[in-house]
Amino acid sequence: MKVLVLGLCRTGTSSLYVAQKELGMKPYHFRDIAFNTEHMKLWLTAMRAKFDGVGKPFQGKDFDQMLGEYDSVADTPACFFVEELLAAYPEAKVILTTRSPQSWLHSMQNTLITVISWRSWTVLSLFDREHSAFYWPLFNRIMRVMAKGNDPWKASATPSYLEYFDEHYTKVRRLVPKDRLLEWHPSQGWEPVCEFLDFPVPEKEFPHICTSDGNVRTHRSTYWKRWRNVVQKGAQTVGLVGLTVGGIWYFRSRLVGSSR
């Protein structure tokens, strides 16, 4: 592990993730978790241990179960484990992706807070045992951390989001030595990142991705795809049950008829 990107989600972590790939690195991001059932389960276990006191806290090589094959890690839920990751990977450099608290909150309201307000997530997770049964508990727990235990979709959680943002950034700045830390905003582009990580600056433009509209659109697409999958499987099950009942009735009627 060479780089810990400890900024919160919606601070340019996706753009930096793509940029690191273009530099030849192998970064890890929530994108790598979202469709990996085992990783979703591991991170949820780690979060329950840290925030709920359930089970043994993750430390040291425990994180290698998820991060062992990568040389950089970013985004939630990894960025919640500041002390643990600093202890597990003491030689890693730290990039703190930044933006103003109010612009971060506005971005969150237009993306993840909107997505978590889709209240049928819970119902979907009961029927979609292949994906949503793992994704929803993790996503919900992530959002509750940033809402400081409040219902993350409610307007009353707004002050808590801002408090968490301030506490998180204060903690990272306090724990990481300045010579090991780069505070970076996506508008700064390649130069600070490449200088900090000892890479030549690419000639291509720095990638700016994951707009608010794009984030919600991606979630909505996945959300309805999972619902369609549930409905299709339900229809298949109903059809199979109907076929079975019909078959039993047919053979039973033949058997009764032949005995007369």
From Swiss-Prot:
To which pathway does this protein belong? Secondary metabolite biosynthesis
Q: Where are the transmembrane segments?
A: none
SUPFAM superfamilies cross-referenced by the UniProt entry = P-loop containing nucleoside triphosphate hydrolases
Q: Mind listing the UniProt keywords for this protein, alphabetically?
A: Signal
> Where is the signal peptide, in residue numbers?
1-15
What InterPro entries does UniProt report for this protein, alphabetically?
A: P-loop_NTPase, Sulfotransfer_4
Give the family this protein belongs to, as stated in its UniProt record: Belongs to the cytochrome P450 family.
- PANTHER family registered for this protein in UniProt: P-LOOP CONTAINING NUCLEOSIDE TRIPHOSPHATE HYDROLASE PROTEIN (PTHR36978:SF4), P-LOOP CONTAINING NUCLEOTIDE TRIPHOSPHATE HYDROLASE (PTHR36978)
Role description: Part of the cluster that mediates the biosynthesis of a highly modified cyclo-arginine-tryptophan dipeptide (cRW). The first step of the pathway is perfornmed by the arginine-containing cyclodipeptide synthase (RCPDS) avaA that acts as the scaffold-generating enzyme and is responsible for formation of the cyclo-Arg-Trp (cRW) diketopiperazine. AvaB then acts as a multifunctional flavoenzyme that is responsible for generating the cyclo-Arg-formylkynurenine DKP, which can be deformylated by avaC. AvaB then further catalyzes an additional N-oxidation followed by cyclization and dehydration.
Q: This protein is called what? A: Ava biosynthesis cluster protein M
